[in-house]
A protein has these predicted regions:
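A structural "flexibility-hinge" signal
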Residues: 1-197
Length: 197
C-alpha cells in the first residue's frame, strides 16, 4: 500500500525535529531554528503542489520520473544526519526547486519569507534541502510499484491537496497568491491545480 504524502509531510517534520537535525539545517542555511521549521512546514506542501501541477502537464510526469531517477533510489530521510552533513546536500535540490517552481519560485520564496521571518535567500536554501527529501519519499512510495504517468499524476495530485489541508499556513498563502494572480490577470494553473479549481 502506498504511503500518504500527508503522512510523509508529518514524518519529515518529525524527523527534522529529532536530535540535532533542525540545528544542522539551520546552521547550513544561516537561519534560526524557529524560522527554518516554519519555512519547511510551508515549503514542503508547496513543493508537492508544484509536483502535482508539473505531472498534469504534457511531459511533466516524465520530468518528475527523471528527477526520481537522478536520486538513484536514495532517500535522504533514511539517514538524514548524513545527508545534512554532506557539503552537497542542497546542490541538487537547488536545480529541483528551480525546475519545479519555475516563475513561481520568487513569489513563493517571498511569501514564505513573510510568514517565517527568514530572508528570501535563506528560504531558497531551505527549499533546496527540502526538495530532495520530498523527492526521495515519493520515490520510496513507488518502490516496487509500476510508476506510469496516470498513477503518478493521480497520486501526487490527490496527496498534494491532503498536504495543503495539513498545513493551513501553506494553504492560506497559496490562496492569497492565487487571488493576487487573478487580480493581475496573470493567473497560471499552479495554484488552481493545488485546490482543484
Amino acid at each position: 500500500m502506498l504511503q500518504s504524502i500527508m503522512d510523509i509531510v508529518a514524518d519529515i517534520m518529525k524527523q527534522v525535529a529529532t536530535g540535532d537535525n533542525l540545528s544542522q539545517i539551520s546552521k547550513s542555511v544561516g537561519g534560526d531554528e524557529k524560522g527554518v521549521q516554519s519555512a519547511l512546514s510551508m515549503g514542503i506542501p508547496m513543493l508537492l503542489g508544484s509536483m502535482s501541477d508539473t505531472t498534469s502537464k504534457p511531459g511533466g510526469a516524465d520530468m518528475i520520473t527523471g528527477m526520481l531517477g537522478q536520486m538513484g533510489g536514495s532517500n535522504p530521510m533514511d539517514n538524514l544526519g548524513s545527508f545534512l552533513g554532506s557539503p552537497t546536500s542542497s546542490t541538487g535540490g537547488s536545480s529541483m526547486v528551480s525546475s519545479l517552481l519555475g516563475s513561481q519560485m520568487v513569489p513563493i520564496q517571498n511569501a514564505i519569507s513573510q510568514k517565517s521571518g527568514l530572508p528570501p535567500a535563506i528560504v531558497g536554501k531551505v527549499l533546496a534541502i527540502a526538495a530532495p527529501m520530498v523527492m526521495g519519499y515519493v520515490g520510496k512510495m513507488f518502490a516496487g510499484q509500476k510508476m506510469d504517468q496516470k498513477g503518478l499524476t493521480s497520486l501526487i495530485g490527490d496527496q498534494s491537496k491532503m498536504a495543503m489541508q495539513s498545513s493551513p499556513d501553506a494553504a492560506n498563502m497559496a490562496k492569497q497568491m492565487l487571488g493576487s494572480q487573478q487580480e493581475t490577470a496573470k493567473a497560471t494553473g499552479f495554484f488552481k491545480k493545488i485546490f482543484g479549481k
